[in-house]
Amino acid sequence: MDARPSRYHEVYARWQRDPQGFWGEAAADIDWFEKPKATFDPKAGIYGRWFPGGVCNTCFNAVDRHVNAGRGEQAALIYDSPLAGVKRTITYHRLLTETQVLGAVLRDLGVGEGDRVIIYMPMVPEAVIAMLACARIGAIHSVVFGGFAARELATRIDDAKPKVVLSASCGLEPGRIVHYKPLLDEAIALSQHKPDACLILQRPQVEASLVAGRDHDWAKTRDHALTHARSVYDCVPVAATDPLYILYTSGTTGQPKGVVRDNGGHMVALKWSMKNLYGVEPGETYWAASDIGWVVGHSYIIYAPLFHGCTSILYEGKPVGTPDAGAFWRVIAEHGVAALFTAPTAFRAIKKEDPDGKLLAQYDLAKFRTLFLAGERADPPTLEWAEKMLKVPVIDHWWQTETGWAIAGNPVGLGMLPIKHGSPTVAMPGYDVRIVDEASHEVAANKMGSIVVKLPLPPACLPTLWQADERMRESYLDEFPGYYKTADAGFKDEDGYIFVMSRTDDIINVAGHRLSTGGMEEVLASHPDVAECAVLGIKDELKGEVPCGFIVLKSGVNRPPTEIEKECIALIREKIGPVAAFKLAIAVARLPKTRSGKILRGTIKKIADGDRWTMPATIDDPVILDEIGSALKGKGLGAS
């Protein structure tokens, strides 16, 4: 644990006094082809733009600058795939060569500055190279999670209108191969917009059939470019305010929401975060156990670690089952990981399989300093279990696809603040976080309200949605004028610690009482036999809504589930009180989740309420929804 007094309050106050000076200073850590004319232009864009007049290139800052500075032989990426049985180390020098060559391939396929490229790929190094190659030539990448349903991919093709799609023959899941190419072919058949070309990486597990005239073999095309000395030697200078990428928010229905990330602000904020928030030094190994299809993968598998000159882990595997619940410990020990960033759901899975942490004893985690959790609410029992097992600080932090980096966290690099379980700690410099009521008035400490951020948002946050400025205003800015709406609800305590309790749509109204499902989940998760849980409001004729708790029991628990259900009901009554009207707990084998580990609460609610529902495109295993339906039926709920 860090014994130094934290510099956080001093640094945050400095940002408050002079936001432009603060970010102007941070911008000095980036290599610019032309320095920005100003730090911020409040008149540009929807709420202002960062670093106007600046000319830069994201790929240059992620790769070239490190090779130029003598870091070429350091590992940039370590690809570790228990699913493919492959490990590969890619140095900064090698990454530069591959990115230069793929940049030339993209140009030969007609991709120019400002053109869009969709990347529909598994967790392989070529996916990272693809993103960097787009950045190198000034193209805009849009990564779509590999294996995403064809219809969802088609809507993204129609929205982004890519010149080229980069894909692979397949992705790997435990015990099965996911064929990507048929999904891609179907998506292109469904979409109005047709890409000019597709570049397909043939993986050894499956060979995809190629469409003549449209599809190109990745390896052959790359090798041809290499042997003919085709490479984009220099990075294309782009404006700091030009888009780097579009990332569609998961689970959107109908017209997808394309979050735009710009080049300049993104580099400045992410580079700042590596040292100041995550406390990692250049040359150290950093591992974000996520997927490149999600924002965590974009920001902290690829861009931030590479901007900072770190070694980043690209892991194609799971927390459990590849081969066991010791998988994460093996990766940390083998590659000397200093900091791990993952979702709480991964640790709940490990805790369920190996509650006593027996597998941990097999590995030497001497270099491991910090565990960071984000992506969903981190329940205190999971945090406490991780602290007890790992004996390192376990830090919850909170952010969104839209922001690209932490809104709130515990800044390791500035000296840690005391941890309060259930809180992602405090607002990061750049974010003026307020808790407000429906009329945008700030509420008192410890009182629930909507969490908002006073405009302008800091560098790296979305300037807008792709070709949808009006939708940006409607979605995020209109409800609370002068603020960005996070759509999360929570409170701040007397020390300014932020507690994110639930999405605003997860606040349930029980007979006029506004109750947080997050608070109830915290209580259920404290039961010694509960591995994980979800609480949601279901329709009730008398009270409007009543809470219903779904609980997954730990491995090895052999008591009757009905007994544990009764204990859970009693526990909520004891800790929250009868006002919660919590009378329904249902033990289930597992909870339905998105591939990024978020529980599909909305879908469970629709099933429980007997409403019509559609299969979420992001679901990990559709069979689980049938199991939920059966469990509800057993309690006389859901569609009859």
Task: Please give the residue ranges for each predicted region.
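Conserved AMP-binding/adenylate-forming core of the ANL superfamily
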Residues: 59-60, 77-132, 149-154, 214-223, ...
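Conserved pre-ATP/AMP-binding loop-to-beta segment of ANL
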Residues: 73-75, 198-205, 211-248, 255, ...
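Structural core segment of the AMP-binding/adenylate-forming
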Residues: 132, 136-220, 336, 343-344
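AMP-binding/adenylate-forming catalytic core of the ANL superfamily
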Residues: 144-169, 184, 333, 340, ...
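AMP-binding/adenylate-forming catalytic domain of the ANL superfamily
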Residues: 196, 200-202, 574-599, 611-636
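Gly/Ser/Thr-rich phosphate-binding loop
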Residues: 216, 310, 338-342, 352-418, ...
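Conserved AMP-binding/adenylation subdomain of ANL enzymes
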Residues: 267-285, 295-339, 352-358
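Conserved ATP/PPi-binding loop(s) of AMP-dependent carboxylate-activating enzymes
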Residues: 426-430, 441-476, 515-517, 612-613
